[in-house]
Amino acid sequence: MIRWRKGEVVRVRREWPGAVELDVAVAEGECRALAYPPLVGRPEVGDTVLLNTTALAMGLGTGGYAMVVAVPDRLPQDPSGPGHLVKARYTPLQATVLGADEQGSPHHEALREADSVDGMPVVVADLHSALPAILCGLYADSPGIRVAYVMQDGGALPAWFSMSCATLRQRDWLCGVVTTGQSFGGDVEAVTLHTGLLAARHVLGADVAVVAQGPGNLGTGTRWGFSGVASGEAVNAAAVLAGRPVAALRVSEGDRRERHVGVSHHSLTAYGRVALAPAQVVVPDLPGGFGAAVREQAAALATRHEIVTVPVDGLHEALKASPVRLSTMGRGLEEDLAYFVTSAAAGRHAASLLS
C-alpha cells in the first residue's frame, strides 16, 4: 500500500503557496518530491526526509511525486489557534482546521441559519483542469465579478497541490478557495459541499461558484468507478440550496479513449443518472460533424435537464489569455480545443445568468 523511503534534500526546485518541490537523494538515485510546509514544515537542503514513494512507483501523471511525510530531525512547532475540524481523518497526517461555520469561527453567525445561496450560478465540472477554462469564459463576458472555487475531495485533498489555484488566487481570478469534505488548505474550510457553497456566497461574497474536484482524477474505466461522479451530487447540492446549477460537459476531440471522445461517459453518468435535480447543461455550438455529434450525445440529458446551446465565438482568444497553462490529461489548448472551449462556454453561460 505504501512504499517508504528515507532521503536527503539536495535542492529546492520551486515553491508556491502551501507547497515546495524538491529533489531528494534516495538509495535508488534522485527523485522529485513534494512537501506541504503547513503540514510538515519547510524542508531545507541537507535535511533528512521520510517519503511516501507510492505514486512514483505507479508512474502517476498528475500526482507523480514522492510525498514528504516528515522532516524527522527538524519537526515544526505545534500549531496554535482555534479549529476543531479534522480532515484527512484517521490517517497519519490528519490535520485540524478552523471550519467556516464552527462556533470559534468569525463566520459562525452568518452561516448558522444560512439555507440558500440566493440564486447564485454554480458551475459544476468533472475535472480540475476545467477550472481555469470556465473562468476564461466567465471573465470574457463579465470582468470584475467575484468567483469562488469550491473544491470537492475526489482528487487531491490539499488545495496546495494545485499550482493553478495558487496563481488564480494571486491574479485575483478567484476571490477564494473553499475546501470541502476531506479536502483542506483553502481560504475557507467546510464540512460538506453544502456548507462550502453557503460559505462561498455568504463568507467570500461570490457572484458565481465553480465546483470541481482537485487535481488527480480517479477512474477505473467503468460506468460508476470514477471520482467525477460527485459532479452529479454537486448539481443536487446547488439546487437544494436555491442555486442555479450549470453543468459543464466533459467533451474531447483529442482523447484516444473512445469512452471520452465527444461527450464523456463521465458526464452522461454524473448528469444523467446521479443528478436528480434539473440543471442547465451547456452544449457549445461547435462546428462540423464533431459539433453535431456532441449535440446528439448531449440530447440524452434533456429528459431531466435543460439543454442550453452557447455560441463559442471569441472563446478561443479568451482561453489564450488564461493566466495559467491549460492542460488536461497531458493535452494543451490546441491539442484538445473542444475540451477547453466547452468548459469556457459553461462559464460564458453562467455569466449571462448574472444580468
Q: Residues of each region from the PLM?
A:
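A cross-family phosphate/adenosyl-ligand binding-site feature
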Residues: 5-13, 155-162, 170-182, 319, ...
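Phosphate-binding glycine-rich loops and their immediate beta-loop-alpha structural context
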Residues: 95-190
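A structural signal for small-residue-enriched, beta-sheet-centric alpha/beta enzyme cores
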Residues: 177-197, 202-203, 209-310, 315-317, ...
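Structural motif
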Residues: 31-34, 47-49, 120-122, 145-149, ...
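Extended, charged alpha/beta regions that create polyanion-binding interfaces
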Residues: 1-119, 133, 142-146
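Extended hydrophobic packing segments that form well-structured cores
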Residues: 48-53, 305-355
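Flexible, glycine/charged-enriched surface loops at secondary-structure junctions
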Residues: 60-61, 144-145, 245-250, 256, ...
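Conserved active-site and cofactor/substrate-binding residues in soluble primary-metabolism enzymes
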Residues: 4, 37-44, 125-129, 133, ...
